[in-house]
Amino acid sequence: MRNIALFLTYLGTDYHGWQVQKNLPTVAETVEKACAMIVGHSVHVTGCGRTDAGVHARCYVANFRTTSTIPCERLPYALNTHLPQDIVVTKAFEVHENFNAIGSCVRKEYTHQIYNSRLKDPFYVNRAWFYPKHLDEKIMQEAASQFVGTHDFAAVRSVGTDVKSTVRTVYYYNVERKGDLITLKVCANGFLYNMARAMAGTVVYAAEGKIKPEEIGKILESGNRTAAGPTVPPGGLYMTHLWYDDGIEKFECGSDWTE
């Protein structure tokens, strides 16, 4: 039995997230159906994370097992003929039998786009969070920096997924403005449910003056979800970089992309 890893990119607007859900369109189900048509048997595709409904991926890693002998270099072209235009497989390669797209991943990066202008731009609909009130990116960076390090992130997660621990390590959280577009890039060894979106909401809260950047440490210590900022809309959030190192496989799937 071969274990095949896939690199994908997709727009999440028309899907209820990655994870298969009964009677709802999801990215995983769509990919599984395409794989089954190519390899000639049903497959289970394991993804690197459960992206929420409406969240996009500039890079995403999944794996599945198959008895098919189709060469890996042909798989992307074959699969893409059976996938909709908003999901694309960019690479396929064989990995060792114990490789797991989520378990072997050691770091993830999400990028959040905020379109900060008084006028909407139709080309950013579902691609960036439209926010008409001016935001000071310097204050946002000061707030974002408070999240860096190893902390209990229970205050910036939504209840919905059971986890053994809410402690995570954030390696960087960078804020950059180019014209009306503000980009937030956050990298961690893992993310809790809605954690990236709640962190972005907290950073915006600080820019609005609703909390002070230096208060974020105490908010994290409190574990109180209501003390942090809101969970922002999903349309501006993208998975953009993944790091793998399980002692055998070591590679990255990444994109330096911003609009």
Report each predicted region and the residues it spans:
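Structured-RNA-binding interfaces characteristic of tRNA pseudouridine synthases
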Residues: 1-259
